[in-house]
């Protein structure tokens, strides 16, 4: 309390601290979201119809394209949609992203890329969520303009950006963005802007914090992802579920490893 009350005289000490106590990583630091982001691409794939719960894809220790490979760990093959979440298969989501970006209904990869970006932003990514945390960072979700600038128009294709399928590459998200994604899935398709104060006597709470914000993915698709998350945790050791360690007897827990 004394430190907070007299922060001015301690500012030099605080600002030079190598652990940066004034830097709130939860809302100010962008990170690649990793495999948790597969849930977003899976939901977009379901909405766009490029994948269903009965779609099976093979995985031979990764996704192979030309002489290149985006690697994966050892697990059964082929996998269904739920199993791809349960076992966190990289190749499965490479197939989904490639089918999204090469979808002929969009006419060009640039248009398809921007549609993907629009979907992702509807989950709150690539922008400030609008929370009451100070100095919130918006993160970054790339679109065709970014890749045209880097590679030149016509100089890139789906496999150029294939790492986006597993939450790597140029994506930048804050931990708050990721927590919000989990809340969105738990709510089956909508989220509230994260905020600190829920209610307070004689204080008017901004109504924006009570507004449901839906993604562009139909709510009927979310239980399909939840099913895979449930199996990731509760299928038992030796099943291939990557989150078995999170299981707790007597509780129904869903999860996704990153």
Named regions from a protein language model:
Residues 1-35, 40-258:
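Beta-lactam-recognizing serine transpeptidase/beta-lactamase-like catalytic domain environment
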């Amino acid at each position: 309390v004394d430190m907070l009350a007299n922060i001015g005289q301690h500012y030099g000490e605080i600002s030079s601290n190598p652990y940066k106590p004034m830097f709130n990583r939860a809302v100010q630091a962008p990170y690649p979201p990793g495999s948790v982001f597969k849930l977003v691409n899976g939901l977009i794939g379901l909405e766009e119809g490029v994948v269903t719960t009965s779609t099976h894809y093979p995985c031979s220790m990764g996704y192979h394209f030309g002489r290149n490979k985006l690697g994966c760990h050892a697990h059964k093959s082929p996998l269904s949609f739920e199993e791809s979440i349960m076992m966190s298969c990289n190749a499965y989501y490479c197939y989904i992203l490639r089918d999204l970006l090469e979808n002929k209904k969009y006419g060009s990869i640039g248009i398809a890329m921007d549609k993907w970006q629009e979907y992702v932003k509807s989950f709150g990514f690539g922008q400030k969520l609008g929370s009451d945390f100070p100095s919130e960072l918006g993160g970054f979700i790339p679109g065709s303009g970014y890749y045209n600038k880097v590679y030149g128009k016509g100089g890139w294709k789906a496999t150029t950006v294939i790492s986006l399928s597993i939450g790597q590459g140029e994506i930048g998200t804050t931990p708050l963005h990721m927590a919000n994604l989990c809340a969105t899935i738990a709510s089956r398709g909508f989220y509230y802007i994260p905020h600190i104060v829920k209610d307070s006597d004689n204080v008017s709470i901004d109504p924006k914090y009570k507004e449901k914000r839906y993604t562009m993915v139909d709510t009927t698709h979310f239980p399909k992802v939840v099913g895979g998350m449930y199996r990731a945790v509760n299928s038992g050791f030796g099943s291939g579920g990557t989150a078995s360690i999170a299981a707790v007897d007597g509780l129904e827990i869903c999860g996704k490893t990153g």
